[in-house]
Amino acid sequence: MSQKHKKMGPHDVGGENSIPIDLNDPEMTHWEKYANALRIVVSSKRIITLDELRYHTEKLGDAYFEIGYFERNCLSLHNICINKGIYNEELFSKVRLKKIAEFDVPKINLPDPNTIEHLHDGVPHSHEVSDFQEDETGEGPPDYYYDTLAIAEIMIELGLITKEDITQKIDQFDNVFPNRGKTVVAKAWNDEDFRQYLIEDAKNAISNIGIKLETFADIICMPQSPETHHIVVCTLCSCYPRTLLGMPPSWYKSRSYRSRVVHEPRKVLAEFGTIVPENKEIKVHDSNADMRYLILPPRPSNTNGWNEEQLSEIVERDYLVGVRLPD
């Protein structure tokens, strides 16, 4: 990260010039899923607030640019807990060392295949070296994962959260949340009354079809139209309707997307393969801790007669953020 970036701080609203957006969105590791689940659980229980998390993240200084997204959240959560007196550094260090020890698995000296005497019957065969050696090519957990485990264990011991809270949240992000937005859009495509309700009062409309969003933030639905293209960003951090769409993609959290989409949205959309005519208006909607957006894409013309289940299968996350449109 350049000194220019550090000087500008973590929230650069429209200050970057055409830095290409990395569209790759790698699958989250277990460590990342656990860290994310812990953060969501403690904020949903009001043990901490998103404003506190953001404040402490901004206070990280140059370290903000030197560590990753989940590590920043973990470090900020730890600092909040210390400041609030939830635990002290001595207890944290003790529990952290215990967690590190739990991953300290001794290496086993396996036999040399050339010295093995075969006592079993069968067709003559040989063993490959890989049959007798451990696979040590995999990477262990990153350092911040030990911090995450320590924070979680302390909070569990204090009765603030449970193990089940975390495992349930991981499962929801894997299997529940990513499908909710698809369900909502499919119903809006098939039910004009619901579509109007969704546009007028999205949060209540979604609640009325049995989806509990588990968020304090309001939801605003913006329908794409022939005259206007809508796209969503969070210039401040990474606010996103997680309980409706799942985790935000990596590019959504990236500095290049957050800064560029504000002042050159047409170029950004082109990088996603979405070409918006010059005579069509583009509206960029900035999410925050109190307000999240859902973009309602146009229904494909070749789907007449489809039911909601069929429609939900063709709804993609990128449509609901506004970076892409259905064919």
Language-model features, listed with the residues they occupy:
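Terminal, compositionally biased segments used for targeting/anchoring and flexible tails
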Residues: 5-16, 20-27, 39-41, 60-68, ...
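Zn2+-dependent metallopeptidase catalytic domains
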Residues: 50-51
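Glycine-rich, acidic and aromatic/proline-enriched surface loops and short helix-turn segments
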Residues: 44
